[in-house]
C-alpha cells in the first residue's frame, strides 16, 4: 500500500470523531493565567493547546510554516466546540487542528517520495513525521484522529531512518503481565557496542520527537540513544501510567545485556519534564544498571503535590495528566489526590541518599518545575549537579544547556 493510500485509508470519514478538547471532562477551575515555559511553550488567548514554538522549531519546523498552519485554523468558519477557541473545529476538515497539520505533513511526504537524493528524502520524511506528531498533539487517549496521525508519524519516521546517517533499529521489548512495547535504538557511525542514553520523554510528546537530541548532541560523541513511548501513548498505549511510572523503562534496562549494539555497562537515563520522574526513579531502583541520570525541567514533586502550583498550569496540561492517569471524567479534587501519589518525595524516594550521579537543569520561575525540585534531586545524589538555564535568548540557552548536559553525561559514560 502506498503512503498516500495509507493516509486516505486512515483518515477516511467513518463517523463524527470526538474533538480533542472534549475528551477530558474535568471541572474547570476558572480563568487561566498566562503561562510561558521553555519546554512547553505558552498559552495564547483563544487557543486550547499550548503553542510550543521553541520545541517545534528545535525539531526542524520553520517558524513561518507554524504561522501558516495557525492562520488556516484561525480563518476557518467551520463549527467549533467552543467558539472562543480556534483549535476546536469539529470533524476532520479544514480548520481542524489535526487536519491542517496532517495536510502540511502530506506536502512533505510527497516531497520525500519525489526526491531522488536519499539524504534529502530522509530529511523530508523526518519533517513529515514531526508535523504528524504536532497534528496528534497533545496525544490524549481516545483521540481517534490523533492516533491515526501518530501511525503516519511512525511510518514516516521509519522511512526517514532508512535514509539518514547512522543506523536505527526498531526493537520489541517484552513486559510481563501485558503487551510488548516498541522502541527505537539510534546508533552513530562506527562499530558497537555503544554507550547509550535511555530517553524518558515528556507526557505530551512521542518517542519520535527526540531525533534532534540524538543527531545534534549524542551522535557526534559516539553515543547511541534508545527511546520508548511513555505509558498510555504511541507504542506503549496499552499500558496505563501508574505510580510505578518507571515500570516500562525498567524492563527495557534489564533487557539491554541481550542487545548486542548497546554497551549495557555504560548506560545513562535522560528525563524531560515528567520523564524526569521516570529517570529519577530509575536512579534509585536500578542504580547498578545506570552510570548517570540527567533531568531537564523535572516534574517530580511540586506540581504533583502543590494545589497552588496546579492552579497555575494550563487546562490542556491538566487534561494531559488526567488522560495519562485514565481519569477522563474525574473531578479536579480526585485528580489532585491521585497526582500526589506520583510525587517521588511522597513515595519516600527523593530526600534519601542515592548513589547514582544526577544532574538537573531548570529555568527560574518555571510554572511546571520550580528550582526546589531540581535542588531536591541534586542534593539527594552522592554526585549531584545543579544547572540553571537562563530564559533569554531562549533558543540559544536551550542549546547551550543541552550541550552542558551532554558533556556531563559523556564524562560519566565514555
Curated annotation (Swiss-Prot):
Q: Does the keyword Hydrolase apply?
A: yes
Q: What is its EC number?
A: 3.1.1.1
Q: Which InterPro entries match?
A: AB_hydrolase_fold, FrsA, FrsA-like, FrsA_esterase
Catalytic reactions of this protein: a carboxylic ester + H2O = an alcohol + a carboxylate + H(+)
A GO molecular function for this record?
carboxylesterase activity
One Pfam family this chain carries? FrsA-like
Q: What class of enzyme is it?
A: hydrolase
Membrane-crossing ranges are none
- Tell me if Hydrolase is a UniProt keyword of this record: yes
Superkingdom of the organism of origin: Bacteria
Query: Gene3D superfamilies of this UniProt entry?
Result: alpha/beta hydrolase (3.40.50.1820)
Q: Which UniProt keywords apply?
A: Hydrolase, Serine esterase
Family annotation (HAMAP family) = FrsA
Query: Which family does the similarity line name?
Result: Belongs to the FrsA family.
| Function noted in UniProt | Catalyzes the hydrolysis of esters.
Q: Please identify the protein, giving its name as recorded.
A: Esterase FrsA
Top-level taxonomy: Bacteria, Pseudomonadati, Pseudomonadota, Gammaproteobacteria, Enterobacterales
Amino acid at each position: 500500500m502506498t503512503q498516500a493510500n495509507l493516509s486516505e485509508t486512515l483518515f477516511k470519514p467513518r463517523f463524527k470523531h470526538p474533538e480533542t478538547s472534549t475528551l477530558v471532562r474535568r471541572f474547570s477551575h476558572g480563568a487561566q493565567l498566562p503561562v510561558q515555559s521553555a519546554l512547553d511553550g505558552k498559552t495564547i488567548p483563544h487557543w486550547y493547546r499550548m503553542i510550543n514554538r521553541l520545541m517545534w522549531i528545535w525539531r526542524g519546523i520553520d517558524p513561518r510554516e507554524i504561522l501558516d498552519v495557525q492562520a488556516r485554523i484561525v480563518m476557518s468558519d467551520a463549527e467549533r466546540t467552543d467558539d472562543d477557541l480556534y483549535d476546536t473545529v469539529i470533524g476532520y476538515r479544514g480548520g481542524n487542528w489535526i487536519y491542517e497539520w496532517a495536510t502540511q505533513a502530506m506536502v512533505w511526504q510527497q516531497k520525500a517520495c519525489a526526491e531522488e537524493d536519499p539524504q534529502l528524502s530522509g530529511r523530508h520524511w523526518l519533517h513529515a513525521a514531526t508535523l504528524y506528531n504536532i497534528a496528534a498533539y497533545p496525544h490524549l487517549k481516545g483521540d481517534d484522529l490523533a492516533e491515526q496521525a501518530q501511525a503516519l508519524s511512525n511510518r514516516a519516521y521509519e522511512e526517514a531512518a532508512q535514509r539518514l546517517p547512522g543506523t536505527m533499529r526498531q526493537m520489541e521489548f517484552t513486559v510481563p503481565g501485558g503487551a510488548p512495547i516498541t522502541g527505537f535504538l539510534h546508533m552513530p557511525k562506527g562499530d558497537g557496542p555503544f554507550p547509550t542514553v535511555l530517553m524518558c520523554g515528556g507526557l505530551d510528546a512521542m518517542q519520535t520527537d527526540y531525533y534532534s537530541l540524538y543527531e545534534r548532541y549524542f551522535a557526534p560523541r559516539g553515543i547511541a540513544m534508545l527511546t520508548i513511548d511513555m505509558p498510555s501513548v504511541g507504542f506503549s498505549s496499552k499500558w496505563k501510567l501508574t505510580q510505578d511510572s518507571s515500570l516500562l523503562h525498567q524492563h527495557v534496562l534489564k533487557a539491554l545485556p541481550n542487545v548486542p549494539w548497546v554497551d549495557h555497562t555504560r548506560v545513562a537515563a535522560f528525563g524531560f519534564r515528567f520523564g524526569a520522574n521516570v529517570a529519577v526513579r530509575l536512579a534509585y531502583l536500578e542504580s547498578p544498571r545506570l552510570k548517570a541520570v540527567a533531568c531537564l525541567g523535572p516534574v517530580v514533586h511540586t506540581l504533583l503535590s502543590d494545589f497552588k502550583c496546579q492552579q497555575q498550569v494550563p487546562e490542556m496540561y491538566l487534561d494531559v495528566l488526567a488522560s495519562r492517569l485514565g481519569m477522563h471524567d474525574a473531578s479536579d479534587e480526585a485528580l489532585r489526590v491521585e497526582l500526589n501519589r506520583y510525587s517521588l518525595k511522597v513515595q519516600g524516594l527523593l530526600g534519601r541518599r542515592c548513589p547514582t550521579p544526577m544532574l538537573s537543569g531548570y529555568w527560574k520561575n518555571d510554572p511546571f518545575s520550580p528550582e526546589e525540585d531540581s535542588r531536591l534531586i541534586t542534593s539527594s545524589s552522592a554526585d549531584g549537579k545543579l544547572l540553571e538555564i537562563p530564559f533569554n535568548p531562549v533558543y540559544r540557552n536551550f542549546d547551550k544547556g543541552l550541550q552542558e548536559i551532554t558533556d556531563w553525561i559523556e564524562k560519566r559514560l565514555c
